[in-house]
Swiss-Prot record:
Molecular function terms, GO-annotated: DNA binding
Compartments, record wording: Cytoplasm
Domain of life: Bacteria
One term under GO cellular component: cytosol
Gene: yeeI
Alphabetical list of InterPro entries matching this protein: Integrase-like_N (IPR017856), TACO1_YebC-like_2nd/3rd_dom (IPR048300), TACO1_YebC_N (IPR049083), Transcrip_reg_TACO1-like (IPR002876), Transcrip_reg_TACO1-like_dom3 (IPR026564), Transcrip_reg_TACO1_YeeN (IPR026562), YebC-like (IPR029072)
GO BP of this protein: regulation of DNA-templated transcription
Disulfide partners: none
Name of the molecule in the record: Probable transcriptional regulatory protein YeeI
Keyword set, alphabetical order: Cytoplasm, DNA-binding, Transcription, Transcription regulation
Amino acid sequence: MGRKWNNIKEKKASKDANTSRIYAKFGREIYVAAKQGEPDPESNQALKVVLERAKTYSVPKNIIERAIEKAKGGAEENYDELRYEGFGPNGSMIIVDALTNNVNRTAPEVRAAFGKNGGNMGVSGSVAYMFDATAVIGVEGKTADEALEILMEADVDVRDILEEDDSAIVYAEPDQFHAVQEAFKNAGVEEFTVAELTMLAQSEVTLPDDAKEQFEKLIDALEDLEDVQQVYHNVDLGE
């Protein structure tokens, strides 16, 4: 499972290099979460998750506040949450989550990104069965044993705990996201190195260099699309 954490790290690193894009995507996601429920994260669990994730990407406070105020103001801009599934080079599997205010624009753009980069879109369910929805929480300066002790004291069950880069990485069911964070916060943890609700591949594949290069171009093309929020895959990209 350690490889899966590396894919999240690589994804964070690539997005950190495109701060304006990641901020825009978070702004949209925060707006949608606040508009669909209460604009208060304490009474809106979906919004609370997005805000916790935003912290790990250092999203500026003004962007967060602007998105919430936009939702409070009754803005009429509506977004649909869409999921596309497809295949990359050598049968690699990809899931694309989007937020769009124009479905007729998004689907052709995603299909074109696949088609121009050695991939093809599949039907709903064609690859999702090979992924597990997972909460991933990273805590710096804790060993796996220390993290386990904290979680056991809080009576929180998780799937797995790994150690990497001086951090304990906790994998849990999505509905345990807040419980895991609260357990650590009550133990004095103030910041998290990662706080994600993600789709983790049940097994990963390694691509030859030429296919890997094409695969990375495909992922870049998908992530560059304005409506795309998240891209998940089952390829081991290495260090």
